[in-house]
């Protein structure tokens, strides 16, 4: 499943500062109920995102799945793990581990969002 030209905002999950703990008070990710007890290697393998895109599973069914997110303006790509849900109709990418990695020309920061393409991919866990 995939979608193009999807609005991607950013969120300050700060996973490294929160020890990659999905249930930390500063994080309180929706998927913590199911994924907070996963090993650190699993939780820290990919950057984090919230998902509410137009194509793909919702709620618990989306938790732990991976997306290949592409900034079509620059070609920059990254794999991100779904750890949360959102309500913006797209993605809410972690600032540190995902958004800044694909906002290679700084336009996303200037606009407050990126328009991205995403595709569900195998996390290879």
Swiss-Prot record:
GO molecular function: carbohydrate binding; RNA nuclease activity
Modified sites of kind Pyrrolidone carboxylic acid: 1
UniProt keyword annotations, A-Z: Disulfide bond, Lectin, Plant defense, Pyrrolidone carboxylic acid
InterPro entries per UniProt: Barwin_CS (IPR018226), Barwin_dom (IPR001153), PR4 (IPR044301), RlpA-like_sf (IPR036908)
GO biological process, one term: defense response to bacterium
Pfam family, one: Barwin
Disulfide bonds: 31-63, 52-86, 66-123
Residue ranges of domain Barwin in the record: 1-125
Coiled coil: none
Function: May be involved in a defense mechanism. Probable plant lectin. Binds weakly a chitin analog.
Protein name as annotated: Barwin
Organism in which the protein naturally occurs: Hordeum vulgare (Barley)
